[in-house]
Amino acid sequence: VLYLTFGNKKPAKKLQIAFDKQSKATNPYIYPNHVLEEIADPIIKGQIKYLDNENFPVYNNSEIKYYSLGEEAYLDLLEELAKAKHFIFMEYFIIEEGKMFDAVLNILKQKVKEGVEVRFMYDDVGSLTMLPFKYYQKLESYGIKCISFNHFVPFISAVMNTRDHRKITVIDGNIGFSGGFNLADEYINEKVKYGHWKDTGVMIKGEAVWNLTLMFLVTWNASLNSFE
């Protein structure tokens, strides 16, 4: 029973078909990998080619900032969200009401009022014990477009382990955040649950953010069975 519910790593057939369609539709929008032409070292070139074959091209004109702790990324995340002019995409496994997420949500609500398009996606099981029932409806009431990924169904199902463990923020297509930290207070050590929590992360600026944008849209569109 436990294996059927949580051990099966394969997505439901319907969801897998939706993901496959979205991936094929997205492939033409992946930037051509011009970096390959610039690399002389055969070992490095081979690694870049391998990544490129899996639709993870290496980009020029990009910067990265490393965070050794979630609390280091937190303030930069708030600062960059507040600067958004066009759109914000956020996709997280766990969100929980508290200092971290409440600060994020306040900015998102303000950005909606300013005309910025805000899309938010959280995993229904990852946040199951953290949020009120149908929390996505609350976010939608603020004008935030929201998806609760793969709704939990309270009976034995072979597809309940199809979860979205990503932690991604994309701002205006040129600022991105990713890493191991979710949007909950334990990830910035405001709440001590299992001792001092350490998850790393990065802020990306420039062309490399394009792939994060595409990754978000693939999951978003597959969940809605739409194309954008």
Language-model segments: residues:
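N-terminal localization/anchoring segments of enzymes in phospholipid and broader phosphate metabolism
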Residues: 1-228
